[in-house]
């Protein structure tokens, strides 16, 4: 886990660092907020990772706090994404937008599953708050959106191949997600959720290139 955390932090920092030119004052302000939240999140995550390295386990509350912080980062990122479109006058095409939202949904599912796995024997707090959906409900939402993407007539041979590869990876963890109260397999879910997110990001790039 510690190695994966280090890699993820490096990737996150690189992506945030690539966001430089904003189209307006609103997006500039949101980017500054995002940068501040990221620095705080990064510090919390490093402390948690160091604790995991030295003790082999962590307390439940810091895990729950980090999951909530992750959700706040995602919400702020989505707000910045919308503001950039608004201020630039550019809108994202439908399938590009849907595939990007699907990537965020996969991340939410993975975060909730990891948090639940870490809270065995204790209370679990979803990253979406008290009124959020359960993991199996989120998994069902993921399947429905995948079906919608697959059925889109605008798909090309390339995007259909990408969708097929994503669906194959999804099958490895779908049962575990829908039966999350049974045997916990956090490493399996983390491994394949990362690959699914990578696949969805590649898919959104393919859609964006075709403006669909």
Where are these regions (language model features)?
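Extended amphipathic alpha-helical interaction segments
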Residues: 59-163
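Short, charged/polar, low-complexity loop and linker segments
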Residues: 21, 53-54, 82-86, 212
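Charged, amphipathic alpha-helical scaffolding segments
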Residues: 64-76, 189, 196, 200, ...
